[in-house]
């Protein structure tokens, strides 16, 4: 619903002298087209020239690389403060959707903006949607403002000290031009509240606003995906199905999402079936973790589903509200893998060092669907620990083997193949890579390596690590994440004063952006061939 508003913004204001900050950047595509980057949207060969998010390296019209939500007002406050310190007079504009207002940082920014007493224009794009429907008390006030055309005396924005202007026809360019012209060069922090329609102008998007948030390449005429993925399994849907069954067995089981209900497999129909046993808190990861801790403390069985990239937003709550208290909430971490989203703002390979180093947390790394659900079954049932489970990779993998049903005896690795000379500890989704390395060593060096599924990211199986000192010269660790602060470093530290050689394989610490998966794996020597060469060089 931001196409018309973006055109009006660029008509009224003088970008980049006047600075525009787009929240999340999902709303910035029209902005990019109007600032010299339309070729990336029209010519397939230029597609990768431009990212899906605002990016200062692309254009002087972009001021931040942004991909997470609720940040634009705070960033704009900073730009306004810097402008005032330097004696500037340009307009500072933050564009934020109503869905993003559910995030705590948005409230913090609005509260600060209300006392700045200077030019700061906040465009609230209210299309009555987040990714799915909005949740939170604030939206009752937005509805009241829409119903009264902005005239209600109960006005959330005014209560914070912000001036306020309502535009009921938020997809009408003349109305928008008039509103923006009215607030241009204002000396006060001002909210321009525009009521828009999500997907305006494209019938399939208007008809299914939630589904089209995730849409893959599609046929323009029909709106149908070019590749039919309807028959493919995915961990999101499987998790939702599992939890819905648990809810029927136990009325204290609660599924929690933070603005992305389908991450945990709760489609509109499943949300309806779950009733009060499903809670979407809006885009508020911090609150979601604290809520889960509170539910667990009260005797409930909460399961919070979240993408790896968004776990970063709730570190303090994981540490303070959950783990210090030791409450048995469950967190399922999705897309924690190098094979997931590949843009710099949505990387999924920083969660291992972040989560696994918090005391009291049990962080599990299943290797396949069967092991994942065995761990999830135990995690929901147990009452001793906060448990996080790293959902294994992007694609569903199945194994025909028996998996444990009780993980209460912590930090016990599973030796799946006993060998000698080389021991491979292949964590989670990289278990298959460990199997491939084992086969490569047999083929090329005649070494029958030991293969181990560590299962626990958060601790060491010291008896097994001691056992490996007999008959093994090299221990290899494989992890689907950054090495710094990760699983492999714990193993290397354990063997530090011994004769054991330890090779850690994972990703170097960097903000990789729009990478080719195969190229990134090779750059980090994460192929069976490269690792086998390294091992052969040591064995001689």
Task: List the predicted regions and their residue ranges.
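Active-site nucleophile and cofactor-binding loops and adjacent substrate-binding regions
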Residues: 1-2, 22-26, 55-74, 96-100, ...
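A glycine-rich helix N-cap at a beta->alpha junction
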Residues: 41-50, 115-129, 323-335
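Glycine-rich, anion-gripping cofactor-binding loops and their flanking helix/strand elements
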Residues: 104, 168-184, 271-300, 304-321, ...
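Cofactor-binding active-site loop characterized by glycine-rich and histidine/acidic residues
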Residues: 2-116, 253, 258, 267-268, ...
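Glycine/charged-rich beta-loop-alpha catalytic/anionic-binding loops adjacent to active sites
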Residues: 51-65, 87-93, 267-282, 300-302, ...
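Non-catalytic terminal/interface segments that mediate subunit docking, oligomerization
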Residues: 19, 202-312, 317-327, 426-428
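Glycine-rich ThDP/TPP pyrophosphate-binding loop and its adjacent helix/strand module
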Residues: 62-218, 224-232, 236-241, 361-472
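Peripheral docking tails and interdomain loops at the edges
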Residues: 223-229, 340-342, 362, 482, ...
């Amino acid at each position: 619903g931001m196409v018309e508003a973006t055109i009006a913004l660029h008509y009224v204001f003088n970008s980049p002298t006047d600075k525009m900050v787009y929240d999340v950047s999902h709303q910035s595509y029209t902005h990019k087209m109007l600032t010299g980057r339309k070729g990336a949207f029209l010519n397939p060969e230029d597609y990768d020239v431009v990212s899906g998010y605002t990016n200062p390296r692309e254009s002087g019209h972009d001021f931040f690389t942004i991909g997470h939500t609720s940040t634009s007002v705070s960033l704009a406050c900073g730009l306004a403060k810097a402008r005032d310190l330097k004696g500037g007079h340009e307009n500072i504009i933050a564009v934020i959707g109503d869905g993003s207002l559910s995030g705590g940082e948005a409230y913090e920014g609005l509260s600060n903006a209300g006392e700045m007493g200077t030019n700061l224009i906040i465009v609230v794009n209210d299309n009555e949607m987040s990714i799915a429907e909005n949740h939170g008390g604030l939206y009752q006030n937005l509805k009241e403002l829409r119903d009264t055309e902005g005239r209600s005396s109960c006005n959330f924005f005014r209560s914070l000290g912000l001036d306020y202007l309502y535009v009921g026809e938020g997809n009408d360019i003349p109305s928008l031009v008039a509103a923006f012209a009215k607030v241009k060069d204002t000396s006060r922090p001002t909210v321009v509240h525009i009521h828009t329609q999500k997907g305006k102008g494209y019938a399939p998007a208007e008809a299914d606003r939630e589904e089209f948030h995730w849409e893959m390449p599609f046929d323009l005429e029909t709106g149908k995906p070019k590749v039919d993925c309807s028959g493919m399994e995915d961990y999101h849907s499987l998790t939702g199905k599992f939890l819905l069954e648990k809810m029927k067995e136990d009325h204290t089981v609660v599924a929690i999402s933070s603005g992305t209900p389908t991450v945990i497999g709760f489609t509109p129909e499943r949300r309806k079936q779950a009733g009060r046993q499903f809670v979407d808190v809006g885009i508020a990861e911090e609150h979601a973790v604290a809520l889960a801790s509170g539910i667990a403390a009260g005797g409930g069985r909460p399961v919070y589903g979240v993408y790896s990239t968004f776990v970063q937003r709730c570190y303090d709550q994981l540490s303070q509200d959950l783990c210090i208290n030791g409450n048995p909430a469950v967190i399922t971490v999705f897309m924690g893998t190098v094979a997931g989203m590949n843009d710099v703002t949505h990387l999924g390979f920083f969660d291992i060092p972040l989560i696994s180093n918090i005391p009291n947390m049990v962080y599990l790394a299943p290797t396949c669907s069967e092991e994942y659900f065995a761990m999830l079954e135990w995690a929901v049932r147990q009452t001793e620990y906060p448990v996080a489970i790293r959902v294994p990779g992007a694609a569903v993998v199945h194994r025909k083997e028996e998996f444990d049903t009780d993980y209460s005896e912590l930090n016990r690795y599973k030796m799946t193949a006993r060998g000698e000379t080389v021991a491979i500890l292949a964590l989670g989704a990289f278990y298959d890579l460990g199997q491939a390395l084992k086969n490569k060593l047999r083929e090329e060096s005649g070494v029958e390596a030991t293969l181990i599924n560590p299962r626990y990211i958060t601790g060491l199986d010291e008896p097994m690590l001691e056992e490996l000192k007999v008959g093994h010269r090299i221990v290899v660790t494989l992890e689907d994440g950054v090495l710094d602060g990760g699983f492999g470093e714990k193993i290397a530290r354990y063997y530090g004063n011994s004769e054991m050689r330890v090779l850690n394989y994972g990703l170097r610490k960097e903000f990789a952006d729009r990478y080719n998966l195969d190229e990134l794996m090779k750059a980090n020597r994460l192929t069976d061939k490269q690792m086998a060469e390294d091992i052969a060089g040591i064995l001689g």
